[in-house]
A protein has these predicted regions:
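A short C-terminal helix-loop "cap" of Rossmann-like NAD(P)-dependent dehydrogenase/epimerase domains
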Residues: 19-20, 47-50, 74-90, 116, ...
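Conserved C-terminal active-site "lid" loop/helix of NAD(P)H-dependent oxidoreductases
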Residues: 103, 122, 159-183, 187
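C-terminal "lid/loop" region of Rossmann-like NAD(P)-dependent oxidoreductases
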Residues: 88-93, 122-123, 137-140, 148-168
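Catalytic helix-loop patch of NAD(P)-dependent Rossmann-fold dehydrogenases
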Residues: 5-53, 58-60, 64-65
């Protein structure tokens, strides 16, 4: 699947993002996803392959690698709880705002896309409720509240700061929802609980 990151530099008057919003990628990952989308369209158009094109916005949950935001913060909290790290969470940009979808909801969305969406077209998938947008700073604070270690400091570390930031990514998923009837069922609290518990178990079992 593609990614909401493909949109990159978005202005406030362009929110929420839709299928026709201009792409202004600001990192190599986003460019690679755009290339993937274009080549998939070529295979649909030229060779008749049954390809469903989607751009998925932030989805989180257990087993996501800790090079990403929420897993990285949860991983650090789990280490702090085990005494493996000082009570300081190291971060990059944390004022960027996103709305988050649980990976289980996203997997259901992918299945519905395959079953109900006409091939060749583009669909945005994600939680697009503007009342459920969180900055990464807010997410970290919610994770800290779930920890048995309360006096955890948040500290920006230059090595984790991207040279370019994407302040807000909010997608308009109306087209996809109308075709499939999909709605995300799992909220941010369960997303954070599931992610934090995964990393707690991981560290206990691996002495990481």
């Amino acid at each position: 699947p593609g990614s909401g990151e493909e949109y990159g530099e978005i202005y406030e008057n362009e929110l929420p993002i839709n299928e026709k919003t201009l792409l202004r990628p600001v990192n190599p990952y986003a460019v690679s996803k755009i290339a993937q989308d274009l080549i998939s369209y070529v295979y649909f158009r030229t060779y008749g392959l049954n390809i469903i094109r989607v751009r998925a916005f932030n989805h989180e949950g257990p087993r996501r690698d800790n090079v990403f935001g929420i897993p990285w913060y949860a991983f650090q909290i789990a280490r702090i709880e085990q005494g493996l790290q000082e009570p300081v969470i190291l971060t990059g940009h944390i004022e960027d705002c996103r709305n988050f979808t649980h990976v289980r909801d996203m997997v259901e969305a992918y299945w519905l896309a395959n079953v109900k969406c006409p091939p060749g077209e583009l669909y945005l998938i994600g939680s697009d409720d503007s009342q459920k947008i969180y900055s990464y700073r807010e997410v970290i604070k919610m994770l800290i509240e779930k920890s048995n270690v309360k006096d955890i400091e948040i500290k920006q570390d230059p090595q984790y700061v991207r040279p370019t930031a994407v302040p807000r990514l909010i997608g308009d998923t109306t087209k996809f929802r109308k075709l499939t009837g999909w709605e995300p069922k799992i909220g941010i609290d369960d997303i954070l609980n599931d992610t934090l518990q995964y990393w707690r178990d991981f560290i206990k079992n691996n002495d990481y």
